[in-house]
C-alpha cells in the first residue's frame, strides 16, 4: 500500500464516517488520523453483503439524494435486495474502467459490440454499453435471450465482439454450428463474464466461434462488470489499483494472506462517490499474481475466479469447489466442457453423481473406460468416490444466463 492509496482510503473513511449511514455506525470508534500504515488499515472491520442488505434501500449513500442519478441492484434471488446508488461521477468512472477493459482486450472504436447480458436493475448490460460508448465503438444492445434474433443481428450487423455469460456464449456457438451459418459470422473476440468457467469450456467456445476470449470481472456492489480483465497473454486479470484496493484473506480467519496464496478477495473502493465500500468481502476465491505481465502493463493482476467460498460443498468431510471439478474434467480424454453434479444422501451415506457430456456414449467399451477414468481422477485428486455418468453432447440443459453446476439435495 503506497501513500497515495492510503490517502484515498482515509479520504473515503472520513466521508463515510461523516454520513448518517451503515459505515458511520460500524466505524464510529475509528480515528482516521491514527491509520498510518497498511497494518493499521487491516485492523478495520470487514463489511459483508448482509450489512448492505440491512442498509436497504439507500442507507449506503454518503451523498445528498439529489446527486444520485441511478441505482442498481444485485442479481441475488433471495432476501432483501442490495441497492447501490450511483452519482454521475460513479457512472463516468465506471465507463472509464470498462473502456480500459475493452482496450486491454484489443477492442477499438471500429468494433461492433453485441451485448447479450441483461439490462434494467442489473449492472451487466448497461456496463458493457457504457464502456462501448466511452470507447466510441458501436453498441448492439440486444439484452438476454431470443437466440434467433441474436444470430440474425450477428450476421446483419456483422458484430465483431460478443459480450455474454460463458453459458450463453456456448449456447450461441452450438446454435451457429447447427444452423450452418458460421461463415456468415464476423466475430473476432468474446468478452465473457458473470460466472466462473473452466479451461475446457473456454477452449470449446473459442474453437466453435473462432474468437479470442477475455475474462471480465466485476460485481454490482463495486461498480459492476469492468473492474478486471485478462490481457492477450492470459496470465491473470489486470485490475485497476488507482480505483480499487484488493486484499486476499483467509476466508476462515480473516487474516491477510501473502501474494500468491489462494483466498477470498476483499475490495475497498478508492474513488466511489455515492456508496464507498470499505474492506468488502466478495466471497470470490482467487490469488494475487506477482511479477510483471509479459504485456508490459503496470496494472497488477489476480488469478481468474476459481470459485466462491459459498459454492463449496462438503462430502464425507472433504471440501469441494467447482474449480477443482473443472480441473478434473479438463484432463479427461473425450470429455466436453459441460457437466452437472448431483449430491444426495442414501442409506446413511452421501452420494455424488457426476454427469459429463462426451461424444463417445455410443461405444459401450469407450464409455465404460471414460467413466472409469473419471472416477479414478476424482478419487486421486479430491479423495472422494463418485458415481460417473457419461451422457451425450447436448443432453445437459443449456442456459441463457448463469449455469448451475452443482445440485445438493441432502438438505
Question: Where is each model-derived feature located?
Answer:
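AMP-binding/adenylate-forming catalytic core of the ANL superfamily
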Residues: 162, 271-382, 401
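Hydrophobic C-terminal alpha-helix "anchor/cap" residues
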Residues: 16, 132, 205, 329-333, ...
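Conserved active-site and cofactor/substrate-binding residues in soluble primary-metabolism enzymes
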Residues: 69, 89, 93, 167, ...
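Conserved AMP-binding/adenylate-forming
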Residues: 197-292
Amino acid at each position: 500500500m503506497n501513500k497515495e492509496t492510503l490517502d484515498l482510503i482515509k479520504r473515503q473513511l472520513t466521508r463515510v464516517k461523516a454520513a448518517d449511514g451503515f459505515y458511520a455506525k460500524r466505524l464510529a470508534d475509528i480515528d482516521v488520523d491514527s491509520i498510518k500504515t497498511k497494518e493499521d488499515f487491516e485492523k478495520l472491520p470487514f463489511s459483508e453483503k448482509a450489512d448492505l442488505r440491512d442498509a436497504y434501500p439507500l442507507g449506503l449513500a454518503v451523498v445528498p439524494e439529489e446527486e444520485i442519478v441511478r441505482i442498481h441492484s444485485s442479481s441475488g434471488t433471495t432476501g432483501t435486495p442490495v441497492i447501490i446508488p450511483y452519482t454521475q461521477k460513479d457512472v463516468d468512472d465506471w465507463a472509464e474502467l470498462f473502456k480500459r477493459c475493452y482496450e486491454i482486450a484489443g477492442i477499438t472504436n471500429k468494433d461492433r459490440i453485441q451485448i447479450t447480458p441483461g439490462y434494467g436493475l442489473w449492472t451487466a448490460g448497461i456496463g458493457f454499453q457504457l464502456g462501448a460508448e466511452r470507447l466510441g465503438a458501436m453498441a448492439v444492445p440486444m439484452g438476454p435471450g431470443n437466440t434467433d434474433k441474436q444470430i440474425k443481428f450477428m450476421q446483419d450487423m456483422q458484430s465483431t465482439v460478443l459480450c455474454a455469460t460463458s453459458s450463453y456464449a456456448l449456447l450461441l456457438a452450438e446454435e451457429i454450428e447447427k444452423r450452418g451459418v458460421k461463415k456468415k459470422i464476423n466475430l473476432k473476440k468474446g468478452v465473457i463474464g458473470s460466472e466462473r468457467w473452466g479451461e475446457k469450456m473456454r477452449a470449446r467456445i473459442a474453437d466453435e466461434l473462432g474468437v479470442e476470449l477475455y475474462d471480465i470481472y466485476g460485481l454490482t456492489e463495486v461498480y459492476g462488470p469492468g473492474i478486471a480483465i485478462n490481457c492477450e497473454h492470459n496470465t491473470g486479470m489486470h485490475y485497476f489499483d488507482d480505483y480499487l484496493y484488493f486484499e486476499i484473506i483467509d476466508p476462515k480467519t480473516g487474516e491477510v494472506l501473502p501474494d500468491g496464496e489462494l483466498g477470498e478477495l476483499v475490495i475497498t473502493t478508492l474513488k466511489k462517490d455515492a456508496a464507498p465500500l470499505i474492506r468488502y468481502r466478495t466471497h470470490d476465491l482467487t490469488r494475487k499474481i506477482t511479477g510483471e505481465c509479459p504485456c508490459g502493463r503496470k496494472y497488477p493482476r489476480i488469478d481468474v475466479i476459481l470459485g466462491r467460498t459459498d459454492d463449496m460443498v462438503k462430502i464425507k468431510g472433504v471440501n469441494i469447489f467447482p474449480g477443482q471439478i473443472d480441473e478434473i474434467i479438463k484432463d479427461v480424454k473425450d470429455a466436453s466442457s459441460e457437466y452437472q453434479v448431483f449430491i444426495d444422501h442414501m442409506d446413511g451415506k452421501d452420494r455424488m453423481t457426476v454427469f459429463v457430456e462426451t461424444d463417445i456414449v455410443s461405444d459401450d467399451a469407450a464409455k465404460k473406460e471414460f467413466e472409469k477414468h473419471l472416477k479414478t481422477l476424482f478419487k486421486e485428486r479430491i479423495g472422494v468416490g463418485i458415481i460417473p455418468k457419461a451422457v451425450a453432447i447436448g443432453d445437459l440443459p443449456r442456459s441463457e444466463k448463469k449455469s448451475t453446476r452443482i445440485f445438493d439435495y441432502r438438505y
